[in-house]
Amino acid sequence: MKALLDLFKQVQQEEVFDAIKIGLASPDKIRSWSFGEVKKPETINYRTFKPERDGLFCAKIFGPIKDYECLCGKYKRLKHRGVICEKCGVEVTLAKVRRERMGHIELASPVAHIWFLKSLPSRLGMVLDMTLRDIERVLYFEAYVVIEPGMTPLKARQIMTEEDYYNKVEEYGDEFRAEMGAEGVRELLRAINIDEQVETLRTELKNTGSEAKIKKYAKRLKVLEAFQRSGIKPEWMILEVLPVLPPELRPLVPLDGGRFATSDLNDLYRRVINRNNRLKRLLELKAPEIIVRNEKRMLQEAVDSLLDNGRRGKAMTGANKRPLKSLADMIKGKGGRFRQNLLGKRVDYSGRSVIVVGPTLKLHQCGLPKLMALELFKPFIFNKLEVMGVATTIKAAKKEVENQTPVVWDILEEVIREHPVMLNRAPTLHRLGIQAFEPVLIEGKAIQLHPLVCAAFNADFDGDQMAVHVPLSLEAQMEARTLMLASNNVLFPANGDPSIVPSQDIVLGLYYATREAVNAKGEGLSFTGVSEVIRAYENKEVELASRVNVRITEMVRNEDTSEGAPQFVPKISLYATTVGRAILSEILPHGLPFSVLNKPLKKKEISRLINTAFRKCGLRATVVFADQLMQSGFRLATRAGISICVDDMLVPPQKETIVGDAAKKVKEYDRQYMSGLVTAQERYNNVVDIWSATSEAVGKAMMEQLSTEPVIDRDGNETRQESFNSIYMMADSGARGSAVQIRQLAGMRGLMAKPDGSIIETPITANFREGLNVLQYFISTHGARKGLADTALKTANSGYLTRRLVDVTQDLVVVEDDCGTSNGVAMKALVEGGEVVEALRDRILGRVAVADVVNPETQETLYESGTLLDETAVEEIERLGIDEVRVRTPLTCETRYGLCAACYGRDLGRGSLVNVGEAVGVIAAQSIGEPGTQLTMRTFHIGGAASRAAVASSVEAKSNGIVRFTATMRYVTNAKGEQIVISRSGEALITDDIGRERERHKIPYGATLLQLDGATIKAGTQLATWDPMTRPIITEYGGTVKFENVEEGVTVAKQIDDVTGLSTLVVIDVKRRGSQASKSVRPQVKLLDANGEEVKIPGTEHAVQIGFQVGALITVKDGQQVQVGEVLARIPTEAQKTRDITGGLPRVAELFEARSPKDAGILAEVTGTTSFGKDTKGKQRLVITDLEGNQHEFLIAKEKQVLVHDAQVVNKGEMIVDGPADPHDILRLQGIEALSRYIVDEVQDVYRLQGVKINDKHIEVIVRQMLRRVQITDNGDTRFIPGEQVERSDMLDENDRMIAEGKRPASYDNVLLGITKASLSTDSFISAASFQETTRVLTEAAIMGKRDDLRGLKENVIVGRLIPAGTGLAFHKARKAKEMSDRERFDQIAAEEAFDFGTPSAPAEEPQHPAAE
């Protein structure tokens, strides 16, 4: 019977578990894991290569070296399984038990675990309430700690030096006990009564008032409560027994030449054992205390090094002077266990090769080299050979395959038919980086790739390599075919645009074929059908671009949808079109009108065309259509014979005069500068602006010349038509190149940037066609090198950003259909500077409406709440001019531990409502991270040519309507009768006749208004103008200027321009002022009226004070008369640097990391009225009196710019001091919706600048994850501590429980965490540990006895389960459901039998699967 049971033992059932718990192991636990004590430091006998007994590789402890064979060879073979050899003591079993059997070392003296000592904050320190330094002194035998003070005046845990100790012993004798080393600390830990301490701390927390104490107590309470809850004893932080890793995990490999390669751990263990044995011997010999003490200290250090080398003091080094790799180093970092072996594994059945273009493939195919396929599909071929009886054994089959007999090739064809393979191109930045294809066998050694999937893989054929992977199981093949097949992934998940858009030569071919020419051969002919056109074209009667009339048959959707009616019906109509378009109409899918093709097909048009096809005709038709477009494009491009030659680059004749005029203007500015009318900075700004404009002008002239050409029409008159110049066609079609690049070829290269981003003011007036001279070439190398340097740096940064994003969102999965919330956000079109940057339709497409969408004119409901707004809906909404729609958003979704489909809306990569199980978090992270890398790789394409927009200096209306000013707009009328704006946040709206807002423009401070409130204007009317180069300081009151604190050499400096010799007063930076006194004063102006009295602000007793900021150039003199609206000083704006995602990527990172900006603007904490209090040294005091009359004070540094004036009403959350916004303030004062709007808009700004489209919802998903913690403000009756940060879902669960039990729930504030912080503070310790700061995370988790419920994707990958997303979510759900039903059945049976046992069965509280230790 026992043998039978043993047989069962062999097959290890894989454990099913739902959670993993981590904790501290007690000494007994460690002994129970162990299979024996390691007593000797020996490893293996280097003559016999057999492990030494009781050593680190002992076979008696860890198991046999060979399968089923004991060490001495007495028992061999399977029949002795389980026997323990009496001679060598080795159990006869599998050798692989040496990978799992642990040993232990009994330490002669206890040793502190370094992680709990040194990993900050020190847990030992917290529990004992001692400082880390003191504990260290005790542990390393430098001081005594009092354990029992007895009747003496000493205190427990008091530290004393050796000298003190001996004095006290003389004084008190053995009244008290003090110890040294880990024994002492262990005694102290044992003495702690946790329950009592927790009670005391809770009462202290309630009674204490000091912030510092509250913080300290809360921290300590948290740790102690964790001990209390988890049942872990604090003294287990001190080791008495040290576990020994199984030997196969720290191997010792003999090299040839009698040397050994060994894991560093063996060295570290040897040291521990040696010191431990020496200590044992010293203790037996009753050696002097000082020697024993030294040995104990050395043992402590040896164990420290084994656990975490280098954490304390110098790292232990091996023979070759490099630090040894300890246990902690094994798991942390990129090369550690988590990231190297658990999250990224190497897989078999894979190969890689160079890719070449496969233009004859269908979209779902790839060409696989025969030899590769033969190797990859070997097992399948062996199987087939055996089944067919060609080979009798695997060995024979192997031989067949090696000889590559004809039958093998036939079988290979059969095996790979309909067996998809996966292709992957590194770096895999988004999910389209891995797609499945059906292999087609080809000769040669390169993989053939379909040209249309290149965009998704970001692949090109200049030597890129791709990897092939074979899905083996049937399920894997099915998933690859349904989810990953290239023809099922035709949209980008980032923005829902088609990813299979033709590019380069395909675009050129299609464009060339759909252009029209004036007076081409056969113009004006009429044809009865497309076939006739083709015949005429083949017989050279017409050209591709000839204008002709053709009768074209379109297949339109049948209105009659009854049974048996055809889906499409033909519709014939006569079109005026061109030959090329008529020929292309053959491939149009059913359901698309000919009008979509009846225009020149540029890249954008083709993208739109494919998009329309996808929405109207479905996936299959679109894929076929795209394939046919590609074939036609290649064919037509070949036939077109377009080429580039130097003569295509036409330099405009007016170039010289344009450049000459600019040079004259620059001279004029130089002259003005010399005579002191402008500052150096202003001169530089203006010069750069002139050259930008010149560059534009030359470019424009060049494009005008390139883009049209003169022709004679049919009537013999000369007219102009769009040019057939090759270079122009390439750029215009979007095939390659851009207007900027053509301008460098044939216009002028323009301004160049230095590596720091500032612009060199002498432009390169030559172009590449004329050639650059040496100086010009030298200037341009600057930018080119910067581009290359940037690329290298930014790729790494972008990859790290993606990694952080993935980590923070990896556990966000769609888990239910609808959470039923009624919250959402109001979406409006995004308008900047009067331009609609993003239309409303784009922002609400694919979202679910949360309130009914109502027709503004008839007030009838168009779409009920809960409708998914698709293309037709958003077009209708746009047509009716609805300007705001409330939609669901991931931010307000009420699903716990996930998202619901309705709040997320459309899955952009599939074009329909998102499926339950979709890992939307990872998709969001990829969508934001992928372009980051793309962009950073693209900085250098403009060759550093400074692409800087000329600065806006006016604003004009885009539409007809009525001007309205917002409530914040304030202006004064100056002596000339001009209206000067003195508000900083004023906006001008333009409304149509029924009062709907059409556009809105910010009007800056100091602008001159040209239109007033209520004026009716036409489109194109200027509303306001201003000087973009300087910021003025304007007075709102008239009077005589009286300077205060304007002392030369103290607060202001006389700047004498070295060129002009004229002087101006400039306010000096506070840091550069000499004396302490001058740092606190602020140069300012008061105004005196005719009687010499100070002018007061109307309605108050405060005198008008106008302060000058640092850097201001004061333009008035002391005692000068000024009028209302006059400029007192100017602040020159910084010279602008070129914008480029180089600045952009760090910006995105700092937004997602929620960093508070330096010198952040200050927001009003309450709604109320402002007034200025008494200024303190260096600060001015702003007071806001709220509606109840309470005063809130803000102290503001004097050099800051205050945006409010006296007695102004401000709203809570309004900016009162200028500066960049702090996201934490926005969340606190304006709420989640405002915060999300801020982050989304800011992130989108960066990407939009690069022309990258990302859907808002991806950014919202990330923001949701940044908001997943809350801070408890009042704990009610819950288990939380005030001030503690907890997971939102946890807190809501706990509150639900409290409400159900009729107790008081906790109240909380939202907290915004940066993505790194949010990843580390996740509930899953496995996920956090594999991200960053592994040691700290694991230490904390172990003390808390944390339990990881394996909710996210990462944790599950690490423990090797199916991830709870996609098909895995369904699997886990089914498993849980089955368990529940099994348990219910079990309970039922138990209940029926309960009366037999006479005991009612306890309900199964715990899940059946205990947490795996």
UniProtKB/Swiss-Prot annotation:
Reactions listed under catalytic activity: RNA(n) + a ribonucleoside 5'-triphosphate = RNA(n+1) + diphosphate
Record-listed Zn(2+) 1 binding positions: 70, 72, 85, 88
Domain of life assignment: Bacteria
GO MF term list: DNA binding; DNA-directed RNA polymerase activity; magnesium ion binding; zinc ion binding
EC number: 2.7.7.6
Cofactor: Mg(2+); Zn(2+)
Note accompanying the cofactor annotation: Binds 1 Mg(2+) ion per subunit.
GO biological process, one term: DNA-templated transcription
Gene Ontology cellular-component annotations: DNA-directed RNA polymerase complex
Keyword Oxidoreductase set for record: no
Positions that bind Zn(2+) 2: 819, 893, 900, 903
Recorded family membership: Belongs to the RNA polymerase beta' chain family.
NCBIfam families listed in its UniProt record: rpoC_TIGR
Quaternary organization: The RNAP catalytic core consists of 2 alpha, 1 beta, 1 beta' and 1 omega subunit. When a sigma factor is associated with the core the holoenzyme is formed, which can initiate transcription.
Function according to Swiss-Prot or TrEMBL: DNA-dependent RNA polymerase catalyzes the transcription of DNA into RNA using the four ribonucleoside triphosphates as substrates.
Name of protein: DNA-directed RNA polymerase subunit beta'
Gene source species: Burkholderia vietnamiensis (strain G4 / LMG 22486) (Burkholderia cepacia (strain R1808))
Taxonomic lineage of the native organism: Bacteria, Pseudomonadati, Pseudomonadota, Betaproteobacteria, Burkholderiales
